[in-house]
């Protein structure tokens, strides 16, 4: 049975750990609020980008651009898992990596070659440990991603796609639902779906009322410049979703850790009180026994 002093040391240690987990919970909550604000701020830009591409696409007579090329035979696929640079976030990193490997198994069963582009230290370390060859690794920014980070990733995957090294690019990341819920998502980002160039009847009617636009340069050239920006925006949105998911998962994990620490402190305190009671009882018995021996 543990002594009173040993139990006191354990209680002190757990209390110190609880202070750390509470601090981490507060930091994660603050970062989560900022991430939510950035996601909200991006939405109008992303929606306008979609409208702009659709409008230019309607004006283009023919669209044959590398990023839109749908290849008949898919021989190689690049998987891009978005993970964090740090742990202590519950199952946040594990579920992305697990889904990415499930996608890999499915592709390999079809005879497709898989290439990897890692985002986040946790993903990179797991892929390296499993001896996967990386076609790119982007680290050190997952807490607060910048648009430049999305540009770098977009440039690399576009390079692989246009060079014919891969025929498809799949993004695997956590979509932010709430602080308690993160949903693993697979998204094909290359080739860009031609659906973004399609419009409904209302939009076509609105174009008719506005009349014909004069484009300078030609619509095809504008679209060629817009599509890479569209790809960057899609990746940036996924990075922001992943960041919010990570902070939500970390906040929840640290809250649970603090709760468990409190319960452990209560249990250890009860054990310490019982141990102290047993020591006092033993001392009383020894005193009484000594007094009886003298009588």
Where are these regions (language model features)?
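C-terminal beta-strand-loop-alpha-helix "lid" module of Rossmann-like NAD(P)-dependent dehydrogenases
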Residues: 1-295
């Amino acid at each position: 049975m543990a002594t009173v002093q040993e139990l006191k040391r354990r209680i002190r240690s757990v209390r110190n750990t609880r202070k750390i987990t509470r601090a981490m919970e507060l930091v994660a909550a603050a970062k989560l609020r900022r991430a939510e604000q950035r996601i909200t701020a991006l939405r109008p830009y992303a929606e306008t980008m979609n409208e702009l591409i659709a409008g230019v696409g309607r004006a283009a007579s023919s669209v044959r651009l590398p990023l839109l090329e749908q290849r008949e035979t898919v021989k190689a696929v690049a998987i891009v898992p978005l993970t964090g640079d740090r742990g202590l976030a519950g199952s946040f990193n594990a579920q992305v990596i697990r889904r990415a490997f499930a996608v890999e198994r499915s592709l390999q069963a079809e005879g497709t070659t898989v290439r990897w582009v890692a985002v986040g230290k946790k993903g990179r370390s797991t892929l390296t440990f499993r001896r996967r060859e990386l076609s790119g690794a982007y680290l050190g920014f997952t807490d607060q991603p910048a648009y430049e980070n999305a540009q770098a990733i977009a440039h690399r995957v576009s390079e692989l796609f246009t060079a014919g090294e891969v025929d498809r690019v799949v993004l695997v990341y956590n979509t932010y639902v709430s602080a308690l819920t993160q949903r693993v998502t697979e998204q094909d980002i290359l080739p860009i779906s031609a659906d973004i160039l399609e419009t409904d009847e209302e939009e076509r009617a609105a174009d008719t009322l506005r009349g014909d636009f004069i484009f300078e340069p030609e619509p095809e050239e504008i679209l060629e410049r817009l599509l890479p920006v569209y790809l960057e925006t899609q990746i940036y949105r996924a990075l922001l979703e992943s960041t919010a998911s990570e902070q939500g998962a970390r906040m929840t994990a640290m809250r649970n850790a603090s709760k468990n620490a409190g319960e452990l402190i209560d249990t250890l305190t009860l054990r310490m009180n019982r141990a102290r009671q047993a020591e006092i009882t033993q001392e009383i018995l020894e005193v009484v026994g000594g007094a009886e021996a003298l009588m």
